[in-house]
Regions:
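N-terminal capping segments
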Residues: 20-120, 124
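Generic serine detector
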Residues: 7, 23-26, 156
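N-terminal secretory signal peptides that target proteins for export/translocation
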Residues: 1-5
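Aromatic- and glycine-rich peptidoglycan recognition patches
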Residues: 122-137, 142-204
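Bacterial N-terminal signal peptides
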Residues: 7-18
Length: 204
């Protein structure tokens, strides 16, 4: 991103913030921040989970677990349950990337492409091709990492000294709050407002 465009994005965030201010985004970011120092291991191993409300031990996880735990702790939304119910209702709407013919409640919600699909289906997608948009606390961003790896994180309410929003994520060192918003090519931007949150809760 060129410097002028980056500055414009940050200005838009400042101007738009009051319209989206409220307890909901702050609860989400706080729940993600609470994971820093607790989740200290990146562990992508497949695990059999309880259902609903299943999780691997809190000291470990992957990038999606930051989002899953934040929505569960901050908003009472169980993405394990939501993804399972939505995939059962329309399995063909979800990416066919893993050779599966039915849902797997242990892993479906822990895959970035599935979360991207879910967020788009509930109307949370913020288009990437319509010019600069603000990045607000609680927004969810996806990226493509080197090696064609998918990544996901949550926009923090904290900024760098230059004014860039920090990102809450787990990229290999446990949950961290870091300046990586513009570090990798973005593949998705999602904002879960009240309407989208209601749709998620209705799927539980």
């Amino acid at each position: 991103m060129i410097p002028d465009m980056r500055s414009l994005v940050l200005l838009l965030a400042v101007l738009a913030a009051p319209a989206f201010a409220g307890s909901e985004p702050s609860r989400l970011t706080a729940a993600a921040q609470d994971q820093v120092g607790v989740t200290v291991i990146y562990d992508p191993a497949y695990a059999k989970l309880a259902f609903p409300g299943g999780d691997v031990p809190r000291d470990r996880g992957v990038c999606t677990d930051v989002v899953i735990r934040a929505l569960r702790d901050g908003w009472g939304i169980d993405l394990q349950l939501v993804v399972n119910h939505d995939m059962k209702a329309d399995f063909a709407a979800y990416p066919a990337l893993w050779g599966l013919t039915k849902t797997d409640r242990n892993i479906d919600h822990r895959r970035v492409p599935n979360l991207q699909t879910l967020f788009a289906r509930i109307g949370a997608e913020v288009p990437l091709d319509e010019g600069p948009v603000p990045y607000l606390p609680g927004d969810i961003i996806t990226w493509k990492l080197p090696g064609n790896l998918d990544h996901i994180g949550i926009v923090s309410d904290r900024l760098t000294v230059e004014g860039t929003p920090l990102i809450l994520h787990n990229i290999g060192r446990g949950a961290q709050e870091e300046d990586i918003l513009f570090a990798y090519p973005m593949t998705g931007h999602y904002r879960i407002g009240k309407d989208q949150a209601k749709r998620l809760k209705a799927l539980q």
